[in-house]
From Swiss-Prot:
Catalyzes the NADPH-dependent reduction of N-acetyl-5-glutamyl phosphate to yield N-acetyl-L-glutamate 5-semialdehyde. Transmembrane segments: none annotated. InterPro entries: AGPR_type-1 (IPR000706), NAD(P)-bd_dom_sf (IPR036291), NAGSA_dehydrogenase (IPR050085), Semialdehyde_DH_NAD-bd (IPR000534). Keywords: Amino-acid biosynthesis, Arginine biosynthesis, Cytoplasm, NADP, Oxidoreductase. GO terms for cellular component: cytoplasm. GO terms for biological process: L-arginine biosynthetic process. This is N-acetyl-gamma-glutamyl-phosphate reductase. It catalyses: N-acetyl-L-glutamate 5-semialdehyde + phosphate + NADP(+) = N-acetyl-L-glutamyl 5-phosphate + NADPH + H(+). GO terms for molecular function: N-acetyl-gamma-glutamyl-phosphate reductase activity; NAD binding; NADP+ binding. Pfam families: Semialdhyde_dh, Semialdhyde_dhC_1. It is an enzyme of class 1 (oxidoreductase). It is found in: Cytoplasm.
Length: 339
């Protein structure tokens, strides 16, 4: 058994980490930290894990005796503690944005924070960077929007098929975090669709890093808040390069089958089948569909993920499994909750 600790376990992602790790056959959670809830039993904050026996403690990094540590802290906090954690010889998976970027200047521009650590993490998207993750001591867990957007578009840029991608994502309110605000107040979200940060959401920089890095691909992104609790539905409009303007939907599908055909957590929908949020809720699966091309050369791809699982904690556990040499699906091979 491997010992696991979670730094900052009181939020939604921390709760999901606990839910899944407590059902994981190869690990034991031995420490969960929180300054705010020091001394509080975990089930007082996360009532769904009653009788886990876990209690929040305000511990220093050097006091965490673990083989692998998840840092589920606010942006800017992880970079202050991760170097000390790595010095103890443990492996770290960071769920904040602090270690997702290859260029810290990009992070500083979009997060408005000075990056004080010169340590580089591996970008934790297993279907693309599995070999790098296997050897990593530090993994930067991808953001929720980038996970669905990148996976639904990656075969297009990897095969140099498109030169422009316009991404539209609908997200549930849990993506805004555990603290209430006027944005997530029920009367403001019910019976409504709220676009926000329509051209300036920080996750566009993460998507651009992973998609623009292949070729001269221009990426645009707009998120919308919708009145559901969990899930991100992404529609990607990608525009074919002129030299590929005669590609057919069947040929398009073959690129995705070649890329994802052996990937357990990625499910490609049949022709005419639309992925739904309700099908992935509570699971680590990514459902991808669409595969349509219109007369203008626009490819329409769709994806659905659970933002708290595949978009955060489930993907972090998938990365943990890879880093520890375990079967990648351990603790994650459960299907979604429907209805």
């Amino acid at each position: 058994m491997y010992n696991v600790a979670i730094v900052g376990a009181s939020g939604y992602t921390g709760g999901e980490l606990l839910r899944m790790l407590l059902n994981h056959s190869e690990v034991e959670v031995n420490n969960i930290t929180s300054r705010k809830y020091d001394g509080t039993p975990a089930h007082k904050i996360h009532p769904h894990i009653r009788d886990s026996g876990l209690v929040f403690k305000n511990k220093q990094p050097s006091e965490l005796d673990a083989d692998i540590i998840f840092t589920a802290t606010p942006h800017g906090a992880s970079m202050k503690i991760v170097p000390d954690l790595l010095e103890t010889g443990t492996k770290v998976i960071d769920l904040s944005g602090d270690y997702r970027y290859r260029d810290t200047k990009v992070y500083e521009k979009w997060y408005g924070l000075e990056h004080t650590s010169d340590i580089k993490g591996v970008y934790g998207l297993p279907e693309i960077y599995r070999d790098e993750i296997k050897k990593a001591d530090l993994v930067g867990n991808p953001g929720c929007f980038p996970t669905g957007a990148i996976l639904s578009s990656y075969p297009l840029v990897d095969n140099d098929l498109v030169d422009r991608i316009v991404i539209d994502s609908k997200t549930g309110v849990s993506g805004a975090g555990v603290n209430p605000s006027s944005t997530t107040h029920y009367p403001n979200i019910a019976d409504n669709v709220n676009p926000y940060k329509i051209s300036s959401h920080r996750h566009v920089s993460e998507i651009q890093q992973e998609l623009h890095g292949f070729e001269d691909v221009k990426v645009s992104f707009t998120p919308h808040l919708v009145p559901v609790i969990r899930g991100i539905q992404t529609t990607s409009h990608s525009f074919l390069r002129e030299e590929h303007s005669d590609i057919t939907p069947d040929e398009l599908r073959k690129f995705y089958e070649k890329t994802y055909g052996k990937e357990y957590f990625i499910k490609l929908m049949d022709d005419g089948e639309i992925p739904h949020l309700s099908s992935v809720r509570g699971s680590n699966f990514v459902h991808i569909g669409g595969f349509e091309i219109d007369d203008t050369g626009r490819i329409v791809m769709l994806s659905c993920i659970d933002n708290l699982v595949r978009g955060a904690s489930g993907q972090a556990i998938q990365n943990m499994n890879i880093m520890l040499g375990l079967d990648e699906t351990t603790g994650l091979n459960h299907f979604g909750l429907n209805p």
